[in-house]
Regions:
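Hydrophobic membrane-insertion alpha-helices, especially the h-region
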Residues: 17-33
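Periplasmic-binding protein-like
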Residues: 48, 101-110, 129-133, 171-172, ...
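Short beta-strand elements in bilobed, periplasmic/extracellular small-molecule ligand-binding domains
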Residues: 70-82, 86, 169-174, 192-211
């Protein structure tokens, strides 16, 4: 079977992980110093961390570095996995508040979730600093934000595609409601919009997960959708697309583009 696999931005995104990590360390240190000035008794820094999911190599790598530094400094790191559930993430934020953490580091399941934002407001009112990582929150002002340029990542995918193919019938794999994922797709769409040779023939919701992308792509294949390119919001969804294409034994070559630099 002719299948062309495109690994987009792997080296770039590995650098991005460390850029986000060291930026985050700097922000936490600044907050720690400020907190120390307010509290004369020296104590352990308590940090609550909740990513949208830990089923993603990007967050696993980022968290491993944060854990390493926290261990070296003797700080307490409370890490929770909401598993893409906004209700669960809201409860985790409330738990961090009850545990009297100094800082909450959050990668929101949904940037505009009323439940998540309400919990963050309660935490902020309790004097807890809020840091958003690799995404943004709507209608809420964080104390610090450490993000990659997700829009530009989408632009780079489009530029790579147009450099390698003169035309394409594109299936998009998305995660709606997550600002970072939406920015990636928007950057891609804005870049190809003036090029009629590149057509969007389908859009599927995958929440960036392999186990959701596989059946979604299998279904569009079985429905007879004709496409020669898959553009996924991340590598987890791209891997699901690859598995679906192999499972359905497509004869024509399919290009697959993903973002994150996952192995």
């Amino acid at each position: 079977m002719g299948l062309e696999e495109e690994a987009v931005q792997k080296k770039h995104n590995r650098v991005m992980i460390y850029t986000i990590f060291w930026s985050l360390v700097f922000v936490v240190v600044v907050i720690y110093l400020n907190a120390s000035q307010l509290k004369p008794v020296k104590g352990q820094m308590r940090i609550g961390v909740t990513y949208m999911t830990m089923n993603n190599e990007f967050y696993q790598t980022l968290n491993a570095e944060i854990e390493r530094v926290a261990d070296e400094k003797g700080d307490l790191l409370l890490v929770r996995n909401p598993e893409l559930d906004e209700e669960k993430q809201s409860q985790q934020i409330d738990y961090f508040r009850q545990q009297k953490v100094n800082v909450i580091v959050i990668n929101p399941v949904k940037g505009d979730s009323p439940k998540i934002i309400a919990s963050l407001k309660r935490a902020q009112q309790a004097g807890i600093k809020i840091i958003a990582v690799d995404s943004q929150l709507s209608h809420f002002t964080v104390d610090a934000s450490v993000v990659s340029d997700n829009y530009q990542a989408g632009v780079l995918v489009a530029q790579r595609l147009m450099k390698q193919k003169n035309e394409a019938k594109i299936l998009l794999l998305e995660h709606k409601g997550t600002i970072s994922a939406e920015q990636r797709i928007q950057g891609f769409l804005d870049t190809i919009q003036s090029e009629p040779a590149y057509q969007i023939v389908g859009r599927e919701e995958t929440r960036g997960q392999t186990e959701l992308a596989l059946p979604a792509v299998s279904q569009v294949i079985q429905d007879g959708l004709v496409f020669d390119t898959v553009v996924a919001l991340n590598d987890r969804a791209a891997i699901g697309a690859l598995a679906a294409i192999k499972e359905n034994q497509l004869a024509q070559p399919i290009s697959i583009y993903g973002i994150d630099g996952s192995p």
